[in-house]
Regions:
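Surface/interface-facing alpha-helical segments and adjacent flexible terminal/loop regions used
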Residues: 2-79, 83-208
């Protein structure tokens, strides 16, 4: 996958702060995303929030031992976003503009999250740029394993980018195999449902 995405200077309501700012709280796994009832959201925002919720599922932090930290949660968001981006690439219409909009939604949220967490205006832009570059690197690293259905390739990328180490371990392969199962189920989701922002992905993770 060519990482042909660029940041845009737009603003939107943040919800990532609710994922990232409570990492020290003992009940973070039980905390739900804020309700958006009564607020009209664009389909791409709905899809982003669904990917975000998928990345928060307890199974990743308990069974797969992803670090319960800001970095760990961001790494899982990058992994789940990579699955969604790879799925969108396979859509019949291959709506590249929609994929760009999804990327924008993610990093508008990252920007506002960092501000909510107290980062100064001067530092936010640099951190957002660094995080967007990190995501694009992961997007490329994960794509080969996802597209080829190769758990070993995907596991090597997960070891480096989720567990932050060069040596591989059994848990890398377990998480890679889980991601491939999720990706296979995503392929069965209708393109129209994805473009409508249907909350399907997080449900797939919960029932996997």
């Amino acid at each position: 996958m060519n990482a042909e995405f660029a940041l845009k200077g737009q603003e939107t309501k943040a919800s990532l702060v609710n994922v990232m700012s409570d990492v020290a709280r003992p009940n973070w796994l039980l905390k739900l995303l804020p309700s958006s009832k009564g607020q009209e959201q664009a389909p791409v925002e709905k899809l982003y929030y669904d990917v975000l919720e998928a990345s928060r599922q307890p199974v990743f932090y308990l069974e797969y031992e992803v670090a319960d930290t800001f970095d760990g949660r961001f790494d899982m968001l990058c992994l789940m976003m990579s699955l969604m981006m790879a799925r969108l690439k396979k859509a019949d219409s291959e709506n590249k503009e929609f994929a760009q909009d999804l990327f924008d939604a993610m990093f508008r949220d990252v920007d506002l999250t960092l501000r909510e967490m107290g980062a100064g205006d001067l530092g936010v832009g640099k951190r957002v740029k660094k995080m967007s570059e990190a995501f694009l690197g992961r997007l490329t690293a994960y794509d080969k394993g996802l597209v080829e259905g190769n758990a070993s390739i995907l596991a090597a990328a997960i070891a480096r980018n989720v567990y932050r180490r060069e040596e591989e371990a059994d848990i890398d392969l377990r998480l890679a195999e889980q991601c491939l199962r999720l990706f296979a189920r995503l392929e069965d989701v209708a393109d129209a449902d994805l473009y409508a922002g249907a909350p399907i992905f997080s449900q797939l993770v919960r029932t996997a």
